[in-house]
Amino acid sequence: MKRQLILEDGTVLIGTGFGGEIEKSGEVVFTTGMTGYQETLSDPSYCGQIVTFTYPLIGNYGINRDDFESIHPSVNGLIVNEICNHPSNFRNEISLNDYLKERNIPGLAGIDTRKLTRKIRQYGTLRGRLCNMDADVEYIVSQLKATVFTDHVKRVSTKDPYPSPGRGHRVVLVDFGMKHGILRELNKRDCDVIVVPYNTTAEEILRLSPDGIMLSNGPGDPKDVPEAIEMLKDIIGKVPLFGICLGHQLFALASGANTSKLKFGHRGLNHPVKNLATGKVAITSQNHGYAVEEESVENTDLEITHVALNDGTVEGLRHKKFPAFTVQYHPEASAGPEDANDLFEDFLTMIENFKKEGEELCQNA
């Protein structure tokens, strides 16, 4: 079955279709991970996107029940050079092709993914549509140029609060499109977690008596979530806070900094990040299309703690006055290296220190 990818600049790439027999539009991006395709297609941060894999053969080890980052995949399509229809792995339960058919997600194989990746790197992220061979190219191009993708966070955030009980510190986890890996890391440390929707107010969060607040990853432009920015303005300084990815960007906006769209984003499992305080470099998992503008941090109460070695963009922030820090990358990995996993320990240490300071103030009062 032939299928084509039509880009907003009029480029047409023809290959073999797999997965769901449906036409879908989305922002065409690329990821450089050699593995982790199951985590990628189930990562809510990819909501509304058509993901191109730069590694030439995808699907080798199939799909298993353990590696999902959300219950429902959020990608609008997959593009690969070659798909493996006969996976081999002791955990394999279903092939990637069959899984995408079940979930009605279209795929395209047999195209030059290097050519597509170079185009995205040269011209920036492009809107595209995976469609049948009888599609009207001119009409599709006109529709793509007029399309604006919004409300991604609303689509992937939980609709209702729910608990993930533990005996340790109570952490309110604000879900902007949370990867399950973040929740797993908190559960591993016996945190008493309450997951809440993206539009939960500061008053509602504080009513839960949290020891700490965690801001999850999520899709899209942080400026499309004004309610979260307002919530953070009211909550920063009252409770220890740790943000990841979109949570990092929202924290920056609430603190007076600015964000902007990257030309083609950071997506992959091997991005080097430097800790400016220690000089240490961590290899990190990343997935974002926006970043905090370095110059905008200067006149705020924030300090830059980490930078990307590939392009110098801001990868970490800390508040100068209050117990709050954030990172642009994914310390929970899933998939990817676990070099930055100790940030969860730093978060819990910050909570403990904040509690001790509060107890000392009460004793001295």
Curated annotation (Swiss-Prot):
Pathway of action: Amino-acid biosynthesis; L-arginine biosynthesis; carbamoyl phosphate from bicarbonate: step 1/1; Pyrimidine metabolism; UMP biosynthesis via de novo pathway; (S)-dihydroorotate from bicarbonate: step 1/3
InterPro entries xrefs: Anth_synth/Amidotransfase (IPR050472), CarbamoylP_synth_ssu (IPR006274), CarbamoylP_synth_ssu_N (IPR002474), CarbP_synth_ssu_N_sf (IPR036480), Class_I_gatase-like (IPR029062), CPSase_GATase1 (IPR035686), GATASE (IPR017926)
GO cellular component: carbamoyl-phosphate synthase complex; cytoplasm
Domain of life from the UniProt record: Bacteria
Residues involved in L-glutamine binding: 45, 218, 220, 246, 249, 287, 289-290
MF terms in GO: ATP binding; carbamoyl-phosphate synthase (glutamine-hydrolyzing) activity; glutaminase activity
Active site: 245, 330, 332
Role summary: Small subunit of the glutamine-dependent carbamoyl phosphate synthetase (CPSase). CPSase catalyzes the formation of carbamoyl phosphate from the ammonia moiety of glutamine, carbonate, and phosphate donated by ATP, constituting the first step of 2 biosynthetic pathways, one leading to arginine and/or urea and the other to pyrimidine nucleotides. The small subunit (glutamine amidotransferase) binds and cleaves glutamine to supply the large subunit with the substrate ammonia.
UniProt-recorded name of the protein: Carbamoyl phosphate synthase small chain
Name of the coding gene: carA
